Amino acid sequence: MDEWFTNTQKVDITTLGRQYVVTDYGVMLGSSEVQTQKIQAVIDRAASEGGGVVVIPQGTFMTGALFFKPGTHLHIAEGGTLKGSDRIIDYPILLTRIEGETCKYFAALVNADGLDGFTISGQGTIDGNGLNYWQEFWIRRQWNPQCTNKDAQRPRLTYISHSKNVTIQDVHLINSPFWTNHVYKSDHVRYLDCYIYAPTENIFPPDPKRGAPSSDAIDVDACTDVLIDGCFMHVNDDAVVMKGGKGTWADKDETNGPCERVLIQNCRYGRVHGCLTLGSEAVHCRNIILRNCYTERTDRVLWLKMRPDTPQHYEYVLVEGITGHCDRFLFIHPWTQFFKLGDRKDMPLSRCNNITMLNNQVDAKTMFDVKTSDKYELMDFTLDGHPIDFSQFAKAIKNGTVKDY
């Protein structure tokens, strides 16, 4: 593993240039007025004057989509809240990346594209103010059970793309209308000691079991060299997700790409669907490590989503030193939600190989929940050094012997 992954030192914001406290530039304290233009003007001013740190001081400041520029950074002071507008008109439609596709969709609350060294810091909060979006989603789903996530028209909390040397540290990232953190085509990205939360129930009175839909904690989309260390994650979907593209020709599309060299460590999970999920919108995931984490009540620790319409290859995944409680430790099923298989004669066979589980002490209701398909094969799975043969479930795992776990 590269030495870069050992660096968990926080960024000292005093080294990032002048601090621009937004209230010094006409931004008013108060949660009701949407002040997108005023806050964006502070960002633009900082960029024009050589860069610096845009500071959200104590208090609540409501805004729509903000776009950070080269040399600028965001700091949320303790007691400060950057709160998202709950009106979709405050988030412009632009060419972006969502659900494994490059397409026109709504901007996120905090956007950073093409930046080197961008930092989000502070003990304060970025609050997506998602309640109205969540309730609209579930009402729409009642009206049309086939509606997609994009049909509901919701912004993400943060979207970082085509960037490098990025650090998000210490902040509270809560109540996102859609995905909480989405990073795309970026490298050397660190999430350090972040608190990531979205409610998992009691947000929709007709059905109290409903939570914030598709509020993934961190979506890693076609990125390399990502470190997630010391974070707390409790969301109504998957926690850390490897993405990279979907569709029958996804491996031929240059807007897609692999996820490689991702380390998740020392994290704590509340309720999530999966601690580490590969897919469903993923093409190639390689050298992914989940280690030394605690899960309170996750549904699945490792979830490998296999799309029948997408050529996928998941390899060299290590899950080590996980403690706590879960329903299912390893979960592998075909994923058929909203899939569309094209007519491709040379469609590659999808594969999972070299999946290692080592020294885990998890109270699991089910250790393995594995289904197979003629669309993919599973090879070289090991548990504590012992090869696993899932022939008791199906015939798709090779190179193993049956053991009773």
Question: Which sequence ranges carry the predicted segments?
Answer:
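Extracellular/periplasmic carbohydrate-active domains that bind, remodel
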Residues: M1-Y405
